[in-house]
């Protein structure tokens, strides 16, 4: 019996030693340090796009739009290694149409409308998604690069009620 206990104890110690030895591993960590991309010009940091005055009668059906109002994001001091940029617009999506910015709530706010952001080719920009079909926009290093966009009102319902139109969005840049 004593002999069996010694063998059992020897086996247990051997297993413990084996499991401690099998825990050795190596983790390799790597990465790259890249040039800084571009600087957003001060006139593109915080600005307002004035969608002008529009009559509620301009929106007779769902999907009717106001005239597009152009705006731009200017990038300067682009490094030599920066060849392109993707831009994502982020904001609260309209409940009726998630491609539109929801109007800020308030007592005098218009209803039945959202704000649509359009790219340089007048195509709607998908909100809150940097990689949703976004194309790389070529950049010229060491020059000002102007990224043209537009914004317009778009009806989300057949009936539009007049009032104030306000919404906020931020933009995110990804450089290549």
UniProtKB/Swiss-Prot annotation:
High-level lineage: Bacteria, Pseudomonadati, Pseudomonadota, Gammaproteobacteria, Enterobacterales
Disulfide bridges in this chain: 38-78
Family: Belongs to the fimbrial protein family.
Taxonomy, superkingdom: Bacteria
Coiled coil: none
One annotated Gene Ontology cellular component of this protein: pilus
Keyword Disulfide bond belongs to the record: yes
Record key words, sorted: Disulfide bond, Fimbrium, Signal
Organism of origin: Escherichia coli (strain K12)
Keyword flag Calcium: no
Gene (UniProt): ydeS
InterPro entries xrefs: Adhesion_dom_fimbrial, Adhesion_dom_fimbrial_sf, Adhesion_dom_sf, Bact_Fimbrial_Adh_Pro
Protein name as annotated: Uncharacterized fimbrial-like protein YdeS
Signal peptide feature range: 1-22
Location relative to the cell: Fimbrium
GO biological process terms held by the UniProt record: cell adhesion involved in single-species biofilm formation
């Amino acid at each position: 019996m004593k002999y069996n206990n010694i063998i059992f104890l020897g086996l247990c110690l051997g297993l413990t030693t084996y499991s401690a030895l099998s825990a050795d591993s190596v983790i390799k960590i790597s990465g790259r340090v890249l040039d800084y991309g571009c600087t957003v010009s001060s006139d593109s940091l915080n600005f307002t796009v004035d969608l002008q005055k529009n009559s509620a009668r301009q929106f007779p059906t769902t999907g009717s739009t106001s005239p597009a109002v152009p705006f731009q994001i200017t990038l300067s001091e682009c490094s030599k290694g920066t060849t392109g940029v993707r831009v994502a617009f982020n904001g609260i999506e309209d409940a009726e149409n998630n491609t539109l910015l929801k109007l800020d709530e308030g007592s005098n706010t218009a209803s039945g409308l959202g704000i649509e952001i359009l790219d340089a080719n007048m195509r709607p920009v998908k909100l809150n998604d940097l990689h949703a079909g976004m194309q790389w926009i070529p950049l010229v290093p060491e020059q000002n690069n102007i990224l043209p966009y537009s914004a317009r009102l778009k009806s989300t319902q057949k009936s539009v009620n007049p009032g104030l139109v306000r919404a906020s969005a931020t933009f995110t840049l990804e450089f290549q």
